[in-house]
Regions:
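GIY-YIG nuclease catalytic motif and its immediate N-terminal context
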Residues: 1-35, 42-66, 71, 76-87
Length: 87
């Protein structure tokens, strides 16, 4: 299974969307600053994740979530979660 996920950085108010085959490992990489794009983030919170059966489906979904309408979907999801407790 491939997981498409979204994280939020509170100080910058930025949303990052990615995909991985090991969400725990990937979140640890983000938090340790081992991801080129997210190493500038200081308060990373996972707020959305969904699994896809294969890489191709996951990549299509990732592209959608990075689109304008996908970003709006994620903003709605972000407002529905309590970021004080991570998923």
């Amino acid at each position: 299974m491939i997981t498409v996920y979204a994280i939020f950085d509170k100080p910058t108010k930025e949303i990052y969307v990615g995909l991985t085959n090991d969400l725990d490992r990937r979140m640890n990489e983000h938090k340790r600053g081992q991801s080129k794009y997210t190493k500038k983030y200081t308060d990373i919170n996972l707020f959305y994740a969904e699994e896809s059966a294969n890489y191709k489906e996951a990549r299509v979904r990732e592209k959608y979530l990075k689109s304008g309408i996908g970003k709006e979907f994620l903003k709605i999801k972000l407002h529905q979660v309590d970021l004080s407790t991570e998923m």
